[in-house]
Design a protein with these regions (language model features):
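Hydrophobic, aromatic-enriched alpha-helical segments typical of multi-pass transmembrane helices
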Residues: 2-242
Length: 242
């Protein structure tokens, strides 16, 4: 039986959505604005130039990105718990894809916050290939493959758990539609990265990155609205019966 919007799982979904929302805002516009204002990293020309321009504040988007990762997995887990029998298997598959997302992105952010900074701070010609391979400043780095395929896995996860939201009012139905849309959008981004490495740092890639951030913001905001409005409606109905 599907759990109601007043269960701990529903409250967890709201909390997870708030954490995810904070992660999107802090790791995206807030962190990027601070980095660009204080110590921007110039366009990639090579590992040596990257090391010269490196500053610890450039890791801020990745540290705050852990909020997004944790919040997103927590949200999918909460929705899987709320799934009724008809959607339980699908939602459980979504949780598995969310776990794959977390593994890929968390590994990438550990590399960006710990491994790459150590290489840049103690730069030597021997470390140049590793910086080029992993730093997200390099549009053709392995880091971008991890990033895009990781978020592709999250897209599959949101696609899978979307039906859980559909019976939580208008906000829930809209959120479900956006959760579904995030699936092919994220998968397309991963495939494009495989076919055209480096596209993420082109004007089109940066524009799509901004659009995806907006999509994610609206998605998680609607989750908060859906569960809060649904819970309020249940409280009003209960009061009326009393």
């Amino acid at each position: 039986m599907r759990q109601t919007t007043t269960t701990p799982a529903a409250r967890s979904a709201i909390t997870a959505a708030i954490v995810t929302l904070a992660g999107i805002v802090l790791s995206g516009p807030v962190s990027l604005a601070l980095v660009n204002a204080l110590h921007p990293q110039p366009p990639w020309t090579g590992p040596e130039a990257f090391a010269r321009a490196y500053h610890p504040i450039q890791t801020l988007p990745y540290f705050t990105g852990f909020l997004l990762v944790g919040g997103a997995v927590y949200l999918v887990a909460a929705l899987q718990t709320l799934a009724g029998d008809a959607h339980r298997v699908r939602a459980t598959a979504g949780l598995a894809f969310a776990s794959a997302f977390a593994a890929l992105i968390a590994f990438n952010y550990v590399v960006q916050t710990t491994f790459v900074p150590a290489l840049a701070a103690n730069y030597s010609p021997e470390s140049a290939p590793l910086i080029a391979a992993f730093s997200l400043s390099n549009p053709r780095a392995l880091g971008w493959a991890l990033e895009m395929w990781g978020y592709g896995a999250l897209g599959v996860a949101t696609w899978m758990v979307a039906p859980v939201l559909a019976d939580h009012g208008r906000a829930g139905r809209t959120a479900a539609a956006l959760f579904v849309a995030n699936g092919p959008v994220s998968i397309a981004g991963a495939l494009l990265t495989a076919l055209r490495p480096g596209w993420v740092m082109t004007p089109a890639g940066l524009g799509l990155f901004a659009a995806w951030n907006l999509l994610m913001l609206v998605m998680v905001a609607l989750v908060i609205a859906a569960f809060r409005l649904s819970a309020d409606a249940r409280c009003i109905s209960r009061s009326a019966r009393e």
